[in-house]
Each structure stands twice: as structure tokens, then as C-alpha cells.
């Protein structure tokens, strides 16, 4: 007996409560589970209620970490592959640093975009993105298309913070043909308090000892707009410590954007490098990779594996 739902006019009713969950033990060290439910809470009393004033599904994800569990064995990366494991500028790659390694990036460009990133590998095949923060600044989109999207996530006082993970599925380090990784992140713009989900399915191929390339389908999901995209990039070794990185991204939607980036990476060591780049992407953080601005910008990024 009783009601478990009310609408915006405080009309009470009964609604069925549902829940669907999926768990995956990736290896003895790391497990992931996700859940979709319209239940308001996890306690016996709140679990019978829908969320206030609505009956919408809620999404959750949990990570189980066992520090002393056995990890998936991967052969160590050689120095050339280790130098590309810091990824590109606007197109990521599928490599994951080995367990226990911290990945740090700092980025700034001539338009005032500023971003910082910290990731930690819980396993040889799973990296947790603990900190991905920054702001887009002085973006000129040259028109009003996608104006609501821009004002919601890239407005004048935006500050975006994000959290996510990167899961390695295939790797030549365990005799697969190429690297394949699933990466997802969630977060919001602190100024508008609006968030989005960003996912990508990253494929990295090592062609020979001086060339590797990436193909990365991407998807942006939000309450304002949702659309897909795809990124292409390559790593061209000019010398042992100097690399050219050309990149292209395009969104798949009405009024699609096509942006390009050209970067030059100097490696002080396989773990430390400096990127100089020229790009008309809105920025290096998630949504910025799929949007184009009117003017090209010069940027710099510092990369560390510790």
C-alpha cells in the first residue's frame, strides 16, 4: 500500500521500481560494475521511491580494486612505444602505462586554454583518470551554430572537471595485432552545473619502427545535445627523440565540425616529453576535441610518466 512517486504538481501515484546491473571482473586485481535504476536510494526505505518529482533512470558505476590481486601480464613497452603512451593532443591512443605509474600532463595555448591531467594505473590494463580539469578561453566559433552547447559547456566563466577510466582490451604486449582501449569520462562545467558523458573506442596500430597510427570513434552524450565523431592521427618518428603528430577530428551531426592539429614532440627521455602544436580544435579536453574554432592557436604541453 502507499505511493512512491509524485510529479511537479504533487500528484501522488504508484510506480514500479526496476534495476539492472552488470558486473565484470577484468582480472583478479580490478573489477567494474554498472547499474541502471529508477530507485531513489539504496536503503530499504529509499529503495522503494523514485527520484523526487520525476521517474527517470539513474546511472552508477563502481570500481573494485584489490591491491594484492594478480595482474594481467604484459611485456614491457620499448622506449619508442613508451614515448607515445602519453597520447596525442586531440586524439588519444590506446596504450596504458604499466601498473603503479602516474601520468601527468599540463597544457596551455595562445588563446588562454589551460588544462591539467593526472591518471594512475591501477593495473597493467586499467588506468584511473583521477583529475582532468581546466577551462576553455576566448573561443571564436564564427557563428551561432551549437550556441546552446557552447554556452553550457564552453561559456565565458567555464571550469570543467572530469573523472574517468581507460581499459585496455587488446595489446601486442600479449600477442594481439594492435592496441584496443575503451575510455570513458564524466564531469561537469562548474559554472553552469551541467555535465556530459564522453566515450571513445581507441585503436592504435604500430606499422613499423617509425610509424604508428590511431583511429578513435568518439561519442558525446548530454541533455543539451548528443553526437558522435571520429579522430585520426599518426606518430611519425623523425629521429629517436623527435616525433611529428598530425591529427584530424570530425563530428558526425548536423553542422559537423572538422578540425586539425599538427604537433611536434621532443622527448627528453621515454618518460618525459614536450609538445608544441598548432590547432583549430576548441581544446584538448573531451568535448573540445570534436569542435572547431575559427582561428588556429599555438599551444604547449608537458608530459610525464612517473
Give the positions of each predicted feature.
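Short catalytic-loop micro-motif centered on adjacent basic/acidic residues
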Residues: 104, 245-248
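Active-site cofactor/substrate anionic-group-binding motifs, chiefly glycine-
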Residues: 129-131
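Primarily extracytoplasmic ectodomains and periplasmic/lumenal surface modules that are beta-strand-rich
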Residues: 124-127, 137
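Outer-membrane beta-barrel translocator/channel fold
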Residues: 1-66, 135-168, 173-202, 206, ...
Amino acid at each position: 500500500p502507499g505511493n512512491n512517486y509524485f510529479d511537479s504538481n504533487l500528484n501522488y501515484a504508484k510506480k514500479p521500481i526496476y534495476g539492472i546491473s552488470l558486473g565484470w571482473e577484468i582480472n583478479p586485481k580490478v573489477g567494474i560494475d554498472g547499474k541502471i535504476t529508477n530507485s531513489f536510494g539504496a536503503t530499504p526505505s529509499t529503495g522503494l521511491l523514485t527520484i523526487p518529482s520525476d521517474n527517470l533512470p539513474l546511472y552508477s558505476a563502481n570500481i573494485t580494486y584489490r591491491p594484492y590481486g594478480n595482474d594481467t601480464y604484459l611485456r614491457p613497452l620499448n622506449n619508442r612505444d613508451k614515448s607515445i603512451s602519453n597520447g596525442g593532443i586531440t586524439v588519444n591512443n590506446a596504450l596504458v602505462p604499466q601498473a603503479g605509474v602516474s601520468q601527468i600532463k599540463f597544457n596551455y595555448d595562445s588563446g588562454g586554454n589551460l588544462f591539467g591531467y593526472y591518471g594512475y594505473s591501477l593495473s597493467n590494463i586499467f588506468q584511473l583518470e583521477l583529475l582532468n580539469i581546466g577551462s576553455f578561453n576566448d573561443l571564436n566559433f564564427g557563428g551561432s551554430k551549437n550556441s546552446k552547447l557552447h554556452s553550457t559547456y564552453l561559456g565565458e566563466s567555464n571550469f570543467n572537471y572530469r573523472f574517468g577510466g581507460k581499459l585496455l582490451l587488446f595489446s601486442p604486449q600479449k600477442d594481439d595485432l594492435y592496441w584496443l582501449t575503451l575510455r570513458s569520462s564524466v564531469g561537469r562545467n562548474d559554472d553552469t552545473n551541467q555535465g556530459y558523458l564522453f566515450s571513445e573506442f581507441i585503436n592504435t596500430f604500430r606499422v613499423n619502427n617509425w610509424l604508428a597510427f590511431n583511429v578513435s570513434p568518439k561519442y558525446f552524450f548530454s541533455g543539451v545535445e548528443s553526437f558522435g565523431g571520429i579522430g585520426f592521427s599518426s606518430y611519425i618518428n623523425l629521429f629517436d627523440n623527435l616525433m611529428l603528430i598530425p591529427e584530424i577530428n570530425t563530428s558526425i551531426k548536423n553542422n559537423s565540425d572538422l578540425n586539425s592539429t599538427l604537433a611536434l614532440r621532443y622527448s627528453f627521455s621515454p618518460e618525459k616529453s614536450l609538445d608544441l602544436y598548432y590547432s583549430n580544435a576548441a581544446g584538448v579536453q573531451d568535448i573540445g576535441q570534436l569542435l572547431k574554432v575559427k582561428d588556429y592557436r599555438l599551444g604547449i604541453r608537458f608530459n610525464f610518466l612517473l
